[in-house]
């Protein structure tokens, strides 16, 4: 009995990743044993995701305002190289998806379109939505989780407080520290939350509905795996000139796993912030780059848009030449960066990409419906790739800047 309690104590105080793994196994086991019991624990997952989503907006706002207000003069934040990495990574993801889709063309079994959804009419509408999110009411931005608006107001307040008294700056620093402590507590509850999420997912879908889309999923997940395990490490190696895999694997393990099950980049912002702190990155940098990455670093979304659009074109017998495929890569990358400005995210940007090939809106919405069917896996993998890449690129840019400073 004493040995058993000792094992439980070790498990409770041990590795969070190990605890999450236990939660996943327990969730799958419960769903296999009893669907009804699994549905009863779904609220644990909802509570966990709800807590992360609730604290993320105020965390981003206070952390950004505090870090900018307390920033020392002549401090390098390395934001430009990080933004370049985000944009290049998203384009590389779209290009990889094009190549894989051409190597393994997929036919879709089109279903009825999704009711009550209205995709944007063009890239102009996506950009217009993003611009208006930028000047959203700050209280509304915090309430609705509009991270573009939160970032804008956080940066504005931080700049305004830059010349404030030291005591005012210290208040913001203390509040920021307090919220970070709350985030650490919520993250410790991840195994319980993921147990509920996994149990509910297996109980509700059983993954039988998505078995018919195995080839499409193989292309989607294959492209995401290539980006996560080959392209991203290659980009990181170019930046830091050393073996990138320890960093990449750690980010996939500590950020990607949580993001996979929460299926929310916003909910994973506190997890990424905590990981950046563990990696000893500059707070002035990651407090801005992580929420910005959750908004514009959308490699997974670019893959989803590209693969489903080319699958639709192949199903309809439309020949896609190399130039059009390259144009699709650009459109998918730009659209993906605006995915946070569209209700429904990457899936509702598919009609925009389909319009390149003259595919009607009715057919495009049927493709969106296919996306919703495979969404349990597609959305989870997409979020895991997007969110873990935020930390990978931030860490790579910070290390590259440190190496340059040492040499200089």
Curated annotation (Swiss-Prot):
Q: Give TM segment ranges.
A: 11-31, 43-63, 82-102, 141-161, 192-212, 216-236, 298-318, 339-359, 363-383
Give the bilayer topology.
Multi-pass membrane protein
The answer, when asked if Cell membrane is one of the entry's keywords, is yes
Q: Which Pfam families match?
A: SDF
**What Gene3D superfamilies does its record include?**
Sodium:dicarboxylate symporter
Of the GO CC terms on this record, one is: plasma membrane
Q: What is its main location?
A: membrane
Cellular localization per UniProt: Cell inner membrane
Q: Which UniProt keywords apply?
A: Amino-acid transport, Cell inner membrane, Cell membrane, Membrane, Symport, Transmembrane, Transmembrane helix, Transport
Similarity annotation: Belongs to the dicarboxylate/amino acid:cation symporter (DAACS) (TC 2.A.23) family.
HAMAP family referenced in this protein's UniProt entry, alphabetically: Ser_Thr_transp_SstT
Task: Show the NCBIfam families listed in the entry.
Answer: PRK13628.1
Stated name of the protein: Serine/threonine transporter SstT
Give the species: Shewanella sp. (strain MR-7)
Task: List the top taxonomic levels of the source.
Answer: Bacteria, Pseudomonadati, Pseudomonadota, Gammaproteobacteria, Alteromonadales
Gene it is expressed from: sstT
């Amino acid at each position: 009995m004493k040995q058993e309690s000792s094992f439980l104590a070790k498990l409770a105080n041990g590795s969070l990743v190990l605890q999450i793994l236990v939660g996943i196994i327990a969730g799958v086991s419960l769903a296999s044993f009893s669907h009804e019991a699994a549905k009863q624990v779904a609220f644990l997952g909802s509570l966990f995701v709800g807590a992360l989503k609730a604290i993320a907006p105020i965390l981003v706002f206070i952390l950004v305002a505090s870090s900018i207000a307390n920033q020392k003069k002549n401090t390098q934040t390395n934001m430009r190289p990080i933004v370049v990495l985000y944009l290049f990574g998203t384009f590389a993801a779209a290009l990889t998806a094009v190549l894989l889709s051409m190597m393994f063309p997929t036919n879709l079994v089109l279903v009825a379109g999704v009711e009550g959804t209205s995709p944007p009419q063009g890239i102009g509408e996506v950009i217009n939505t993003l611009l208006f999110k930028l000047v959203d009411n700050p209280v509304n931005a915090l309430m609705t989780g509009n991270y573009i608006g939160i970032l804008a107001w956080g940066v504005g307040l931080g700049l305004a407080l830059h010349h404030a008294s030291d005591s005012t700056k210290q208040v913001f620093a203390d509040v920021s520290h307090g919220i970070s402590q709350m985030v650490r507590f919520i993250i410790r509850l991840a195994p319980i939350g993921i147990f509920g999420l996994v149990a509910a997912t297996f109980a509700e879908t059983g993954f039988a509905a998505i078995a018919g889309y195995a080839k499409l999923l193989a292309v989607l997940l294959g492209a995401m795996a290539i980006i996560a395990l080959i392209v991203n490490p290659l980009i990181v190696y170019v930046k830091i000139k050393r073996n990138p895999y320890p960093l990449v694997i750690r980010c996939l393990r500590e950020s990607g796993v949580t993001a996979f099950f929460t299926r929310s980049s916003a909910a994973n912002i506190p997890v990424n912030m905590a990981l950046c702190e563990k990696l000893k990155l500059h707070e002035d940098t990651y407090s801005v780059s992580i929420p910005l990455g959750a908004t514009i670093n959308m490699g997974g979304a670019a893959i989803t848009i590209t693969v489903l659009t080319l699958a639709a074109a192949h199903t309809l017998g439309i020949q896609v030449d190399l130039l059009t495929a390259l144009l699709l890569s650009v459109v998918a990358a730009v659209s993906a960066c605006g995915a946070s400005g569209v209700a429904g995210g990457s899936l509702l940007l598919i009609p925009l990409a389909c319009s390149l090939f003259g595919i009607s809106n009715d057919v495009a919405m049927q493709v969106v419906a296919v996306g919703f069917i495979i969404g349990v896996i597609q959305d989870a993998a997409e979020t895991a790739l997007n969110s873990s890449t935020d930390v990978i690129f931030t860490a790579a840019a910070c290390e590259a800047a440190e190496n340059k400073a040492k040499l200089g």
